[in-house]
Amino acid sequence: MSSETLEFQAEARQLLQLMVHSIYSNKDVFLRELISNASDALDKLRLASLRDKDLDVDTADLHIAIEIDPDARTLTVRDNGIGMSRDEVVQVIGTIAKSGTAELLRTLRESADAETSQELIGQFGVGFYAAFMVADRVVLVTREAGATDGTRWESSGEGTYTIASATDAPQGTAVTLHLKPADSEDNLHDYATEWTVRQIVKRYSDFIAHPIRMAVEQPGTDGGESTTEVQTLNSMKALWARSRDEVEPAEYHEFYKHVSHDWADPLEVVHMRGEGTFEYEALLFLPTHAPLDLFSPQGRRGVQLYVKRVFIMDDCEALMPGYLRFVKGVVDAHDLSLNISRELLQQDRQIQVVRRRLVKKILATVKELKANQPEKYRTFWTEFGAVVKEGLIDDTENRDSLLEILSVASTHDPAEPTDLADYVTRMKDGQTDIYYATGENRSTIENSPHMEAFRAKGFEVLLLTDPVDEVWVERVGEYEGKTLRSVAKGQVDLDTEEERSAAEAERERQRTEYADLLTWLSSTLADQVREVRLSARLTTSPACVVGDAHDVTPTLEKMYRAMGHEVPQVKRILELNPTHPLVSGLRKAREQGVTEESLKETAELLYGMALLAEGGELADPSHFTRILAERLARTL
């Protein structure tokens, strides 16, 4: 196939420009990214040769070679791995199909802060594109294992690339960088020198499991001619196989960046070994930042599976539950078959045991952070709390551990979240329920009519603002014998026995006085509500809308419908504040024979205001605003 010039996909072109004009201070990491890609290609070739007996490839000497030419100012990273087809080159390099790309680019454009931009780029992981931080032109030559012809790709990072056939390409991939001039002010080192390359490999890629080789010129002895010697630059020691006291923090950090393609250091390291019936080593990391695709169904899981240091697969879902999908790292199991499939992994007894132990260790680590390193814990929960709470829904085995690390906002202290254990210690005498409220944000919840009685009586309420909160509180149900109870469901009675006795006569009078209005409103609003009653939870608002204890909330209804589920609409209950002038005025207007049409309009306004006050949505906003505008006009 002849040479052709193609344009980068729009988002790839924008990300490429960020690299060409990069503000990232540590440009040395381009080599780490290229070596990581080469290492992945070698792992994939070895795995393919094990699974496909018809694939005729030599895996006896899998390695990475680095070649430098100071005169031509080039640096080449070469591997004899799996290689790529022409279509793969276009797909992998010319296009970015990664979830979150558009969001990343939008945020980067809006950010004027260099440090924030660097963190965002690091969270996304740019891999191959990092080469353009240090190179004016990049040439890639590759041939897929088992194919006869290769592909040559070239670009100067200006929005287009050239792709052509390469009949003489060896198996694997070679990336040649035509380097920019060294510039100390821009943190551009001279990457065509042996010493610089050696230092970068030692710092970032020493643990890579394949040899990284480079031809090194050795001076001759006694004035003789110099010779060239091929040296291995890395130690190739699997970090997870070493004991924790043998590993420096910097080594952990660089290994994390290798497996995660993150550019920030991890928040916490979990290094463990399992012995006995099932032997394994695990090196896991809690990231500092949530990835952009954390809530994407296509988002990548973070744990790689090895068997006796042989790479088996990325994103091993069988090793980590969905609510810990952000955990990165490596698990090396000793007794699995090299040919095990993803499907069989789900049922494998050893994997199930390993998974159970990993989850318990991760949760224990977070609990330890919560107790001893509150700043780290706060960072963790801010980034990943909404995901971790998903585990409360289905992981009954670890539910108690999850509740121990749970952190939620509360009316007790606007600045500091609380946990359930601390809430219980602050409960009033005689209080048997843990009260909570759900909504889009703290402000909406605090200003909701449902909160009025709780605020007046001094009862603490948990403020839950994540969509998953609606689900887990229903599923969990109680904590230490205390029922989790929504302030927006069921009847509310916060009075003491003495207060209840003193107020009983007044309540009976109100029930008698408002009986006719309640009956009329129940009939008038029958299409919207199933009952109208007097409220014990309102102190300043005229009305609110509540549900029964086991009703599906409007937020959950909306969520289920967005997911494509058929959910019958639940009619809710309208509660009235008998001491509010609007409610008492409506009662008097009905007794005085005001026109039915005017009374109905007032009833609709009362119900609509109750919906809006809790952050709900009107079924017919234009009808509501028309009635409201007409009423306001009469007052002028």
Swiss-Prot record:
Protein name listed in UniProt: Chaperone protein HtpG
| UniProt xrefs under InterPro entries | HATPase_C_sf, Heat_shock_protein_90_CS, HSP90_C, Hsp90_fam, Hsp90_N, Ribosomal_Su5_D2-typ_SF
Return the GO cellular component terms, semicolon-separated.
Answer: cytoplasm
Task: Please verify whether the record's keywords include Oxidoreductase.
Answer: no
Offer an example of a GO molecular function term for this protein.
ATP-dependent protein folding chaperone
Q: Which parts of the sequence are annotated with region: B?
A: 343-558
Which Pfam families does this entry report, sorted A to Z?
Answer: HATPase_c_3 (PF13589), HSP90 (PF00183)
Explain the purpose of this protein: Molecular chaperone. Has ATPase activity.
User: Where are the stretches annotated A?
Assistant: 1-342
> Family per UniProt?
Belongs to the heat shock protein 90 family.
Which UniProt keywords are listed? ATP-binding, Chaperone, Cytoplasm, Nucleotide-binding, Stress response
Question: Gene3D superfamilies in the record, alphabetically?
Answer: 3.30.230.80, 3.40.50.11260, Heat shock protein 90, C-terminal domain, Histidine kinase-like ATPase, C-terminal domain
Which stretches does the entry tag as region C?
Answer: 559-636
Q: Which NCBIfam families match?
A: PRK05218.1 (NF003555)
- Superkingdom, according to UniProt? Bacteria
> What is the gene name?
htpG
Q: Where in the cell is it found?
A: Cytoplasm
